[in-house]
Amino acid sequence: MNDCEETNDKAIKALIVFREISDTDNLFAPILCDAIRMTGIDVRCSKEAFWESDTAYDIIHFQWPEEVVGWNCDDPDVIRRLEERIRFFRSRGAHFVYTRHNVRPHYANDIISRAYDIIETQSDIVVHMGHFSADDFAARYPQSRNVVILH
C-alpha cells in the first residue's frame, strides 16, 4: 500500500502543547513527539494549534502550564480562554494528559499558578517522572489517575 491509498484505520490524533519544534532549545518535547510518531500516531507539537485550531484531537498532552499560557503571562483573561479551550476540545472527545515536570515554578505569579490548577484538575491522567511527584499529586488530588515513567 502506498501513502496515497485510503484505509479504514482511523489514526489517533494527538497534540503536544509546546511551541513549534523549530523554535526550541528544549529537546524533551521534540524527542517525545518523534517517539510517539514512530508508533503510528498522528502527532504534532504546537502551542498555536491549542489556541487557534478546531482540529478534533483524541489526546492533548500538556507539558509545562506556563508554556501553554506564556512563561511570564500577566493577562488574567488567559485563564478564561484556557478553560474555554479545554471545554471546546473535551466536547469533541479529547482526553487530556499532563506531564508534571514541576510542582510549581519558582517564580510563578497568580495567573501561572491558576493555569497549573486548571491543567492539573482537568487532566484525565498525569504522568510523573518520579514516585515523590506521584505521591504528592495523589495526596492533593485523591481522585486523579497517575502513572510514573522514570527517566
Mark where each language-model region is.
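Membrane-proximal helix-turn-helix segments that form the acceptor-binding/catalytic region
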Residues: 80-95, 104-126
